[in-house]
Amino acid sequence: MKTLLLTLVVVVTIVCLDLGYTLKCNQHIPPFYKTCAAGKNLCYKIFMVAAPKVPVKRGCIDVCPKSSDLVKYVCCNTDRCN
């Protein structure tokens, strides 16, 4: 019985703990974040070049797009770095 209980505790711990395999990215308002889906291993934020201090959008992405004359993309790969 003790072995079964110990096994259950270990399984619940593994399921509940984030073991570092997922990335967390800020949403539009930075205190709020979401866990990225599998394959989305970058966080990003988009700025309008005319107003570089105000991010337009934030989230998870798989490949960082190239910036243009109007929009600047900033990508990173650590938790809540955007």
UniProtKB/Swiss-Prot annotation:
**What GO CC annotations are associated with the protein?**
extracellular region; membrane; other organism cell membrane
The protein's UniProt keywords, in alphabetical order, are: Cardiotoxin, Cytolysis, Disulfide bond, Membrane, Secreted, Signal, Target cell membrane, Target membrane, Toxin
Q: Where in the cell is it found?
A: Secreted; Target cell membrane
Q: Does the keyword Disulfide bond apply?
A: yes
Q: Could you tell me which InterPro entries the record lists for this protein? A: Cytotoxin_Cobra, Snake_3FTx, Snake_toxin-like_sf, Snake_toxin_con_site, Toxin_cobra-type
List the molecular function annotations (GO) for this entry.
Answer: toxin activity
- GO BP, sorted A to Z: killing of cells of another organism
Entry keyword annotation includes Lipid biosynthesis: no
Q: What protein family is recorded?
A: Belongs to the three-finger toxin family. Short-chain subfamily. Type IA cytotoxin sub-subfamily.
Role: Shows cytolytic activity on many different cells by forming pore in lipid membranes. In vivo, increases heart rate or kills the animal by cardiac arrest. In addition, it binds to heparin with high affinity, interacts with Kv channel-interacting protein 1 (KCNIP1) in a calcium-independent manner, and binds to integrin alpha-V/beta-3 (ITGAV/ITGB3) with moderate affinity.
Task: State the oligomer form and interacting partners.
Answer: Monomer in solution; Homodimer and oligomer in the presence of negatively charged lipids forming a pore with a size ranging between 20 and 30 Angstroms.
Q: What is this protein called?
A: Cytotoxin 10
Q: Which organism is it from?
A: Naja atra (Chinese cobra)
